[in-house]
Regions:
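Anion-binding and metal-coordination hotspots
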Residues: 1-147
């Protein structure tokens, strides 16, 4: 998600596993750079707080704004990141991603897909994501009507 306007930047469907998400993030960052989109930061939830992922993102000159997972261990995010005002802002804006998922599931009808296979589900996801962006763009450019 792009922070300024809340637009969906990329959408990827993977197999359901506990570690697939962390393995995919670096390749998504590489794909975004190939499309000339150079994010300086990426906001992620607690499930992405691993030393390996944080190191891979920093190697790509992307600052990981990962929610700290301190349940029984030390977080991979240190004070270099958390002391900046941008980190706090990113953590607040991160909740908008959940709003996108809510829209995709309710309005977009993507709660229970009727397709099978990663390719078909991924294509359907791109269509629903594009519809979300169109609705979002329409709201952004809409002129308010005088009362």
């Amino acid at each position: 998600m792009e922070n300024r306007h809340g637009l969906l930047v990329d959408f990827l469907v993977t197999t359901a596993s506990g570690t697939a998400e962390c393995a995919v993030v670096p390749s998504v960052m590489d794909d975004l750079r190939e499309r000339r989109f150079h994010p300086e930061t990426v906001g992620l939830d607690k499930g992405y707080d691993t030393r390996d992922l944080v190191a891979k993102l920093r190697a790509r000159d992307v600052t990981p704004h990962v929610a700290q997972n301190t349940a029984g261990r030390r977080s991979a995010i240190d004070g270099r990141t958390t002391r900046h005002a941008g980190y706090a802002i990113s953590q607040r804006i991160r909740m908008k991603v959940e709003e996108i998922f809510g829209w995709l599931k309710t309005v977009g009808g993507f709660r229970k897909t009727r397709h099978r296979g990663l390719e078909k589900v991924g294509f359907a996801g791109y269509l629903v994501g594009a519809a979300y962006n169109l609705v979002r763009l329409a709201r952004l450019v809409a002129t308010p009507t005088p009362a």
